[in-house]
C-alpha cells in the first residue's frame, strides 16, 4: 500500500492506494493538473485585456497559496514567513545592502528548513516536501533583491547588458511581490522567471515586448497575441511519455544496483559502464515530467512567449527549464549543463558567477550544493563537478580544433565525446542520487576513482589554453553553462529596457507601496 505520510491533505488517499504511489506525489501531480486547468481559465477569463492587473495578482496569489496548503499543510506557512521577512529586510536594509542581507537570510532560512526535514523527519527519502517550493522562492527572493540593487543603486555603466535589462527601477508592492513568489503557476515546481518578465505578463505587455525584441520593427506590435495551445499540447505529450517511462522502466534500473556487491564483483568494465549510463538515463524522466509540466502550466496561462523563430513559428521557451534532445545528445560537459535546469543555471550565473571576485566556478558549484540541500552526496557531486568541468574545458581547448575537418573526423570525434560525456555525467551525479556519503564512496571505490584521477592528470599535464578573448572580459570569464544565455539575456534586456520608462512613470501612489522581490 502507498504510504500515508504527508503534511498536506489526505483527501486523495484512496487514489494514492489505487495507483500505489505515495500520497505526497499524488497530491503534487493532481495539484499541477488542477493548476493547468486553472491556467487555461486564467488566460481565457482573466486575460489582461479583460481585467485589471490587481485582480490577476490577487487570483494568481490565492490559487497558489491554496495549492501550497493542499500539498504541504501548515508547512506552507514557511513560504509566507520566508517571503515576508525578506520583504521587510528589503525595506529596512535599503537598496545599498538589501541584496546581501536577503541572500544570507533567504538561503539560511532554506538551509535550516532542509536540515530540519532531512535529519529530523525524513532522511534519505525522495518526497514532494515543502523545501522544494522553497528552493524556487529562494531563487526569486535573491534574484529580485539583486535586480532592485542593480536598478536603484548601481550606475548603468557598472552593469552588464543582461543586468541592465533585468534591473528593477522601483520597489514592488507587497501584492506584486507575493504574486511573484507564490503564484499558482510556479508555486510547486517553478520554474524561475525574472520579476520583470512576470510583471510584463500580468500587465499584458509580454507579447509586445517579445515581438518587438525579435528585430526591433514597429510593425511587429500589430501581430495578434499567439496561442500557446500547440506548445502546451506538445509539452503535455512529453510529460505523458516521461511519466510512462518513469513508471515502467525506471524502477527496473535502480541506480543503487551500481553499488551492489555481487554486481561489482562479477560485472565486467563494459557492463559496469553500460549499466551506469542506462540507470542514470532512467533516473532523468521524473525531472523531465515535473519541469515540462511546470512549463506547460505557465504557457497555458499565457506566460513564456519569447517571440518568433526565423520561420515565423511562435516560441514558448522563455522560462523552459530543459532541452531533452540536447541533453541526451550532449557531446561535452558544457553542452549538458547548458541544457539541464536552465533557469537555475541562469540564477547561479546572475547572483554568483558574474559577481564573484575570485574562483567563480568553485563558488558557483558550492552555492549550487548549498541550495540543493544538506545531503553529503550533493556536495560530493558538485565537488566532482568542479573537477570534471575544469578538466573537460582543458581537453576541449587543447584538442577540439584538430577534429573540425573533415566531416568524417568530426563525426568520429562527436561519437567519442558523446560516450565520454554521458559516462562522465553519470559518474559525477551518482552521489546526488544515492544521497549518503558511504554508498557514494562505495561507488567511487568500485571505479577506483578513475575519472577523478584522469581529471587531475589532465589539469596537471595539459597546457592552459583559453578560448579566444571577447571584447568584454567579463563575458570571457563566464562558465560553460552561462555563455549560451548571453544572446538571449541581452535581447530580453533590451526588450525590458525599452519598457523601462513605462514602468518608472506609473503613478506615485502605486509606486509608494512598492518594496521588494525575487528572480
From Swiss-Prot:
It is an enzyme of class 2 (transferase). Its EC number is 2.3.1.-, 2.3.1.51, 2.3.1.23, 2.3.1.n7. Partially inhibited by thimerosal. Acyltransferase which catalyzes the transfer of an acyl group from an acyl-CoA to a lysophospholipid leading to the production of a phospholipid and participates in the reacylation step of the phospholipid remodeling pathway also known as the Lands cycle. May catalyze preferentially the acylation of lysophosphatidylethanolamine (1-acyl-sn-glycero-3-phosphoethanolamine or LPE) and lysophosphatidic acid (LPA) and to a lesser extend lysophosphatidylcholine (LPC) and lysophosphatidylserine (LPS). Prefers oleoyl-CoA as the acyl donor. May be involved in chondrocyte differentiation. The gene is Mboat2. The active site is at 341, 372. Keywords: Acyltransferase, Endoplasmic reticulum, Lipid biosynthesis, Lipid metabolism, Membrane, Phospholipid biosynthesis, Phospholipid metabolism, Transferase, Transmembrane, Transmembrane helix. It is found in: Endoplasmic reticulum membrane. It comes from Rattus norvegicus (Rat). Belongs to the membrane-bound acyltransferase family. One of its GO terms (molecular function) is 1-acylglycerophosphocholine O-acyltransferase activity. Pathway: Lipid metabolism; phospholipid metabolism. It is a multi-pass membrane protein. The chain crosses the membrane at residues 22-42, 61-81, 88-108, 184-204, 236-256, 288-305, 365-385, 415-435, 443-463. It holds the Pfam family MBOAT. The keyword Lipid biosynthesis applies. InterPro entries: LPLAT_7/PORCN-like, MBOAT_fam. This is Membrane-bound glycerophospholipid O-acyltransferase 2. GO terms for biological process: lipid modification; phosphatidylcholine acyl-chain remodeling; phosphatidylethanolamine acyl-chain remodeling; phosphatidylserine acyl-chain remodeling; phospholipid biosynthetic process; regulation of chondrocyte differentiation. One of its GO terms (cellular component) is endoplasmic reticulum membrane. It catalyses: a 1-acyl-sn-glycero-3-phosphocholine + an acyl-CoA = a 1,2-diacyl-sn-glycero-3-phosphocholine + CoA; a 1-acyl-sn-glycero-3-phosphoethanolamine + an acyl-CoA = a 1,2-diacyl-sn-glycero-3-phosphoethanolamine + CoA; a 1-acyl-sn-glycero-3-phosphate + an acyl-CoA = a 1,2-diacyl-sn-glycero-3-phosphate + CoA; (9Z)-hexadecenoyl-CoA + 1-hexadecanoyl-sn-glycero-3-phosphocholine = 1-hexadecanoyl-2-(9Z-hexadecenoyl)-sn-glycero-3-phosphocholine + CoA.
Amino acid at each position: 500500500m502507498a504510504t500515508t505520510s504527508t503534511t498536506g491533505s489526505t483527501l486523495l488517499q484512496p487514489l494514492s492506494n489505487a495507483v500505489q504511489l505515495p500520497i505526497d506525489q499524488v497530491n503534487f501531480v493532481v495539484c499541477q493538473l488542477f493548476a493547468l486547468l486553472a491556467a487555461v481559465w486564467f488566460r481565457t477569463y482573466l486575460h489582461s485585456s479583460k481585467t485589471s492587473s490587481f485582480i490577476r495578482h490577487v487570483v494568481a496569489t490565492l490559487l497558489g497559496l491554496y495549492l501550497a496548503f493542499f500539498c504541504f499543510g501548515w508547512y506552507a506557512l514557511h513560504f509566507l514567513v520566508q517571503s515576508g521577512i525578506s520583504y521587510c529586510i528589503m525595506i529596512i536594509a535599503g537598496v545599498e545592502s538589501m541584496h546581501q542581507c536577503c541572500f544570507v537570510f533567504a538561503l539560511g532560512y532554506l538551509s535550516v528548513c532542509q536540515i530540519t526535514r532531512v535529519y529530523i523527519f525524513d532522511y534519505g527519502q525522495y518526497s514532494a516536501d515543502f523545501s522544494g517550493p522553497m528552493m524556487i522562492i529562494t531563487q526569486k527572493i535573491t534574484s529580485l533583491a539583486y535586480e532592485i540593487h542593480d536598478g536603484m543603486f548601481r550606475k548603468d555603466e557598472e552593469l552588464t547588458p543582461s543586468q541592465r535589462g533585468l534591473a528593477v527601477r522601483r520597489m514592488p508592492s507587497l501584492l506584486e511581490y507575493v504574486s511573484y513568489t507564490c503564484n499558482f503557476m510556479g508555486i510547486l515546481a517553478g520554474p524561475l522567471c525574472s520579476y520583470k518578465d512576470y510583471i510584463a505578463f500580468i500587465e499584458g505587455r509580454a507579447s509586445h515586448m517579445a515581438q518587438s525584441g525579435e528585430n526591433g520593427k514597429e510593425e511587429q506590435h500589430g501581430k495578434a497575441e499567439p496561442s500557446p495551445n500547440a506548445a502546451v499540447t506538445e509539452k503535455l505529450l512529453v510529460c505523458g511519455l516521461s511519466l510512462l517511462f518513469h513508471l515502467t522502466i525506471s524502477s527496473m534500473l535502480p541506480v543503487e544496483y551500481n553499488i551492489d556487491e555481487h554486481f561489482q564483483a562479477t560485472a565486467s568494465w563494459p557492463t559496469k559502464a553500460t549499466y551506469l549510463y542506462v540507470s542514470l538515463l532512467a533516473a532523468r524522466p521524473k525531472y523531465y515530467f515535473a519541469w515540462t509540466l511546470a512549463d506547460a502550466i505557465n504557457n497555458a496561462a499565457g506566460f513564456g512567449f519569447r517571440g518568433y523563430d526565423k520561420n515565423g513559428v511562435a516560441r514558448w521557451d522563455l522560462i523552459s527549464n530543459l532541452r531533452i534532445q540536447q541533453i541526451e545528445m550532449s557531446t561535452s560537459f558544457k553542452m549538458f549543463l547548458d541544457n539541464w535546469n536552465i533557469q537555475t543555471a541562469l540564477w547561479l550565473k546572475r547572483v554568483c558567477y558574474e559577481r564573484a571576485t575570485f574562483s567563480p566556478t568553485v563558488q558557483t558549484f558550492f552555492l549550487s550544493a548549498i541550495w540543493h540541500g544538506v545531503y553529503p552526496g550533493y556536495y560530493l557531486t558538485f565537488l566532482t563537478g568542479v573537477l570534471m568541468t575544469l578538466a573537460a574545458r582543458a581537453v576541449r581547448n587543447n584538442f577540439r580544433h584538430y577534429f573540425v575537418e573533415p566531416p568524417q573526423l568530426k563525426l568520429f570525434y562527436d561519437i567519442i565525446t558523446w560516450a565520454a560525456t554521458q559516462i562522465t555525467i553519470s559518474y559525477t551525479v551518482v552521489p546526488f542520487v544515492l544521497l549518503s556519503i558511504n554508498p557514494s564512496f562505495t561507488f567511487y571505490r568500485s571505479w577506483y576513482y578513475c575519472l577523478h584521477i584522469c581529471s587531475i592528470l589532465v589539469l596537471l599535464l595539459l597546457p592552459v589554453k583559453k578560448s579566444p578573448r571577447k571584447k568584454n572580459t567579463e563575458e570571457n570569464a563566464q562558465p560553460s553553462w552561462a555563455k549560451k544565455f548571453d544572446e538571449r539575456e541581452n535581447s530580453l534586456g533590451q526588450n525590458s529596457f525599452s519598457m523601462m520608462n513605462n514602468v518608472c512613470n506609473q503613478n506615485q501612489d502605486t509606486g509608494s507601496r512598492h518594496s521588494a522581490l525575487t528572480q
